[in-house]
Amino acid sequence: MGVYRSGVDSGEVPQWYWLRGLHDALVLGVETQEFAYDVTQRKPVRNCMVIRLDARGALFDTSVTAIRLYNYKVLQGAELKGCHWMQDRLRREKDKFILDIIAPGKNDFLYSVRFDFAEVERK
């Protein structure tokens, strides 16, 4: 199992990962899509979550505008819209990734989502 933390050089990380960190990026919104199950594909894409970011105020990586998580399942969390991204941890368990996002609020909270693969939009 690999564990990757933004801002820490922790060895081999997925090419799409924002290694320098998104601290203080603003979450503009979260969109979800469901797709028809395609039985002809070996690993069909069933759904997608898009996390839209304004990273202009982020301390390190200001280029990320959106993160797409495919075949996702939310494990824990509340509404991310309007929150500032404080830190994250990306884990790999078997053939899935788990992204834990810590966002400040009344009490810092954890948003955790499992997914198969991701794409990151950068400006």
Predicted regions and their residues:
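Surface-exposed, interaction-prone regions used to assemble/regulate multi-protein complexes
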Residues: 1-123
